[in-house]
Regions:
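A short, surface-exposed loop/turn module that caps and links secondary-structure elements
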Residues: 37-64
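A generic structural signal for short beta-strands and their flanking turns/coil linkers
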Residues: 32, 49-51, 68
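A structure-centric signal for secondary-structure junctions around beta-strands
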Residues: 2, 47, 65-68, 89-91
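Arg/Lys-rich, positively charged N-terminal/basic patches that mediate binding to nucleic acids
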Residues: 1-29, 123
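Enriched for short, Lys/Arg-rich terminal
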Residues: 68, 73-123
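Charged, well-structured alpha/beta interaction segments
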Residues: 20-44
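Generic solvent-exposed, charged/amphipathic alpha-helical segments
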Residues: 12, 16, 30-34, 111-116
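Non-catalytic, surface-exposed connector residues within folded enzymatic/regulatory domains
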Residues: 5, 23-26, 47, 65, ...
């Protein structure tokens, strides 16, 4: 199975200030990318192939609980039909990242808006 991790424009804009604040974040995100390639459905399921991942920010020194949250949307495509039908190509879209100390939880409305925004811009 081929897994691609894709950064959305929204994720990129939310990431910018965090990169300035936390010098370890690039390395932490590389670890996350590796983990997502191994397990695209990493984190807590929020329904409809959307997941919330607790990300440790090493330079914060607070572990996963005080780190960042990453919202992902997983898309799978079947390439070719064989006897065993399974997704052959998976894309993990990084929709949002936020510092847990700045934002407690993402609301259902914010989540729906994120997905709607992604679906509008990805077509």
């Amino acid at each position: 199975m081929k897994v691609t991790v894709r950064i959305t424009n929204n994720f990129r804009s939310e990431l910018k200030p965090l990169l300035k604040k936390y010098h370890s974040l690039p390395k932490d995100l590389l670890k996350l990318q590796t983990n997502l390639i191994d397990n695209p459905r990493l984190g807590t399921s929020l329904g409809k192939d959307v997941f919330k991942i607790r990300l440790k920010i090493t330079s914060k020194g607070k572990g996963k609980s005080g780190g960042a949250r990453v919202i992902t949307l997983v898309e799978s495509a079947i390439i070719g039909i064989t006897e065993k039908i399974s997704p052959q190509e998976t894309t993990v879209n990084l929709l949002s990242i936020y510092d847990k100390s700045d934002i407690g939880n993402i609301s259902d409305k914010e989540l729906k808006d994120l997905i709607k925004k992604f679906n509008t811009h990805s077509k």
